[in-house]
Amino acid sequence: MKQLIFLLICLLSLLQYRLWLGDNNLSEYVLLQTQIAGQEQSNGKLVARNQILKEEIIDLKRGTEAIEERARNELGMVKEGETFYRVVGSELRERNPFNR
């Protein structure tokens, strides 16, 4: 009976050692869980970004409205018959040395 109790205590000690100090111990487990959570958050942001890009690609393939909007915003395109006006705010006029 004493040998059985001694054997069980040794087994319990070995398991406790592996749990707290051995490979794949509890602290490593917690660290990996935080890394997984961070990676999942990063993946979520990338999935949202990819969805936006997919929608933009579909929009560009379907019609000319998205292409026209992009050309207007990025390239300054003006349609024939339209007049382009640039509105300069008051803060820009104050910084302009030629406007005294």
UniProtKB/Swiss-Prot annotation:
Return the InterPro entries for the record.
Cell_div_FtsB, FtsL/DivIC
Q: Where are the transmembrane segments?
A: 4-21
Query: Ranges in the Cytoplasmic compartment?
Result: 1-3
One GO cellular component this record assigns the protein to is:
plasma membrane
Keyword Transcription regulation present in the record's keywords: the answer is no
Which BP terms does GO give this entry?
A: FtsZ-dependent cytokinesis
Decide whether keyword Membrane is in the record: yes
Any Pfam family matching the protein: DivIC
So which domain of life are we looking at? Bacteria
Q: Could you tell me which residue ranges are on the Periplasmic side of the membrane?
A: 22-100
**Keywords attached to this entry:** Cell cycle, Cell division, Cell inner membrane, Cell membrane, Coiled coil, Membrane, Transmembrane, Transmembrane helix
Localization, per the record, is: Cell inner membrane
Which parts of the chain are coiled coil? 49-73
- Major localization listed first in the record, in broad terms: membrane
Q: Which family does the similarity line name?
A: Belongs to the FtsB family.
NCBIfam families per UniProt: PRK00888.1 (NF002058)
User: In UniProt terms, what function does this protein have?
Assistant: Essential cell division protein. May link together the upstream cell division proteins, which are predominantly cytoplasmic, with the downstream cell division proteins, which are predominantly periplasmic.
Q: Which HAMAP family match?
A: FtsB (MF_00599)
List the protein's name.
Cell division protein FtsB
Organism equals: Shewanella frigidimarina (strain NCIMB 400)
